[in-house]
Structures are given as structure tokens and as C-alpha cells.
């Protein structure tokens, strides 16, 4: 409820989340990765289908959700896919049963289309990481990839998703996959690739060293303190997300 991945990247000045197909291919070839969104040439029918779903009240239709998610993935030519399916009060999948149904549908249809697919259910009953808000989340990601700060839950989920993809592609063990992840984080290669990708897609060229200057900082800050001792038992994550939307 705080926006998607592309909304986060839109907070990076100049970053283009919707490049043309040739630019997308070039960035992937030169850098090795590109975080982008749907373009008019990639699964063009999906946008029209979604608008129809909205009008006829089938936004929550499982088959249509499945086709919407997978159409873009399959059209981009993937050979392997790992999906992070959220479940909890901050997700559209409010219960584990709903999330399982969606996961099973996604995996079944993907495999039917010849795409190796795995879905991992992850908890969204609390904020992932220590930040909430587009720019703040990008800042935390930069600190993570620079190995300056890692939230335990964020690291665990990130490693699980990446390791599953590495196991699927390279046919290696989980332990070997974890070692590969730790190596590229510790030697700075992951950070270097991130910086190259941001620059190639129109963002700042030295974002790792100048991110505090390049990313927009708010002029208004307010600390909110707890007025009594105790443990946090539950977080209404959806309400927190809606508050952020109201704040802009």
C-alpha cells in the first residue's frame, strides 16, 4: 500500500523506469541487469485488460491476476523466475490460504508456458527493513548493497529469493548460492553493478557516493516516541502504508 518497486526508483532523479526496448536490452547486455516497468511494447494487452477488470469488478480474479503478473515476465524472455508473494495485513493476500492459491496458480501457469517458476511466501505483517517511504527505502537499499547496514529480516528474505534463483539457473546448492551472494556484497561488485544500472537508465552516475545529495530529503522531520515500555505485538501495516500515501 506504499507503492510498488517502480515508485521507489522514480524517487531517483533522472532514473527511467520505462525505457524503450532497445535501451532495456542494451543495459542488460552492458550491465547485466535492469529494473524497469512495463512499456507499451511489453505485454500491451495487460493494461487494457486491467482497466476492464477495474470496471467490471474482477480486479481480485485469481486467473486474471495470474495472467497480468506472468504476461510481462514471459514476454521479456525469462528462463527462470522466482516470485515474492506477500501475505499479511499489509498485503492484498490477507490470509495464508489466499497467498497459497495465488502462488499455486502462478507456478502452474508459468510451468505450463515453459518457464521454470518458484513462488516464496513472505510475511507482510510488519515493515520490511527499517524504512517506509520511497526515498527512505532506496537509501536503505543503498546502505544494504554497500554493506553499511543490513536489517536482519530484509537480508533473510533477499538471500532466500536470490539463492533460489541461483539454484534454478546454475544448478548449485543453497550453500553455494549463499556464498556467491556474500561474495558480491563483500567485494563491492553488487554495489558497482547497481550504480552502473542507475547511471545507464538516466540516474546519477555516482549514486553510491553522492546518494545523500542526489536523493530528495524532506525538510520536515518528526520523531514519534512510545509513551510506555513494552513490546510491539502487532503492526497495522496497511494503515501505515495509507498514512504514507496521505503524506505524499
Label every model-predicted segment.
Residues 3-10, 39-40, 46-50, 92-97, ...:
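Short acidic, glycine/serine/threonine-rich loops at helix termini
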Residues 24, 69, 106:
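Aromatic/hydrophobic pocket-lining residues that form π-stacking "cages" and hydrophobic walls in ligand
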Amino acid at each position: 500500500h506504499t507503492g510498488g518497486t517502480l515508485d521507489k526508483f522514480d524517487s531517483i532523479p533522472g532514473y527511467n523506469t520505462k525505457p524503450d526496448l532497445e535501451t532495456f536490452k542494451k543495459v542488460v547486455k552492458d550491465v547485466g541487469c535492469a529494473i524497469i516497468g512495463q512499456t507499451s511494447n511489453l505485454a500491451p494487452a495487460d493494461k487494457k485488460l486491467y482497466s476492464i477488470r477495474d470496471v467490471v469488478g474482477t480486479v481480485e480474479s485469481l486467473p486474471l491476476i495470474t495472467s497480468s503478473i506472468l504476461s510481462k515476465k514471459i514476454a521479456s524472455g525469462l528462463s527462470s523466475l522466482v516470485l515474492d508473494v506477500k501475505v499479511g495485513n499489509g498485503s492484498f493476500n490477507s490470509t495464508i490460504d489466499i497467498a497459497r492459491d495465488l502462488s499455486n496458480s502462478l507456478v502452474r501457469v508459468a510451468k505450463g508456458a515453459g518457464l521454470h517458476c518458484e513462488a516464496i511466501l513472505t510475511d507482510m505483517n510488519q515493515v520490511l527493513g527499517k524504512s517506509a517511504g520511497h526515498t527512505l527505502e532506496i537509501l536503505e537499499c543503498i546502505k544494504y548493497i554497500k554493506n553499511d547496514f543490513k536489517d536482519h529480516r530484509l537480508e533473510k528474505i533477499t538471500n532466500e529469493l536470490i539463492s533460489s534463483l541461483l539454484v534454478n539457473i546454475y544448478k548449485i546448492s543453497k550453500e553455494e548460492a549463499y556464498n556467491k551472494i556474500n561474495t558480491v556484497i563483500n567485494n563491492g561488485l553488487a554495489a558497482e553493478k547497481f550504480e552502473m544500472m542507475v547511471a545507464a537508465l538516466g540516474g546519477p552516475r555516482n549514486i553510491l557516493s553522492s546518494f545523500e545529495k542526489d536523493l530528495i530529503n524532506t525538510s520536515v522531520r518528526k520523531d514519534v516516541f512510545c509513551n510506555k515500555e513494552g513490546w510491539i505485538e502487532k503492526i497495522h501495516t496497511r494503515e501505515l502504508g495509507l498514512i504514507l500515501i496521505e503524506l505524499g
